[in-house]
């Protein structure tokens, strides 16, 4: 490998909204995520509602689209 071309790869912390903290290495540093393997329904077997209605409402507000304005072919 060539010297002095690789980025610094320090330890970092990934924090989930459920409170789970994972220690890893990353060039990004510490950051947070919404869902991790500790709280994801696939791994836990429990159903968890993820709020996507807010994203849809923001999209409609931004672009002026309404559910009834969709054209049917």
UniProtKB/Swiss-Prot annotation:
Pfam families: Ribosomal_L31 (PF01197)
Cofactor(s) for this UniProt protein: Zn(2+)
SS bond list: none
Gene Ontology terms describing biological process: translation
Taxonomic lineage from the root: Bacteria, Pseudomonadati, Myxococcota, Myxococcia, Myxococcales
InterPro entries hit by this protein: Ribosomal_bL28/bL31-like_sf (IPR034704), Ribosomal_bL31 (IPR002150), Ribosomal_bL31_A (IPR027491), Ribosomal_bL31_sf (IPR042105)
GO molecular function, one term: rRNA binding
Species this chain originates from: Myxococcus xanthus (strain DK1622)
UniProt keyword annotations, A-Z: Metal-binding, Ribonucleoprotein, Ribosomal protein, RNA-binding, rRNA-binding, Zinc
Any single GO CC term annotated in Swiss-Prot or TrEMBL for this entry: ribosome
Protein name (record): Large ribosomal subunit protein bL31
Cofactor annotation remark: Binds 1 zinc ion per subunit.
Binding residue positions for Zn(2+): 16, 18, 36, 39
Family: Belongs to the bacterial ribosomal protein bL31 family. Type A subfamily.
PROSITE patterns reported for this sequence: RIBOSOMAL_L31
Job description of the protein: Binds the 23S rRNA.
Assembly with partners or alone: Part of the 50S ribosomal subunit.
């Amino acid at each position: 490998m060539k010297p002095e071309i690789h980025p610094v790869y320090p330890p970092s912390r990934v924090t989930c909204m459920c409170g789970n903290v994972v220690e890893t290495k990353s060039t990004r540093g510490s950051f947070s995520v919404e869902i991790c393997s500790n709280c994801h329904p696939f791994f836990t077997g429990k159903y968890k509602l993820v709020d996507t209605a807010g994203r849809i409402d923001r999209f409609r507000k931004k672009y002026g689209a309404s559910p009834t304005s969709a054209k049917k072919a």
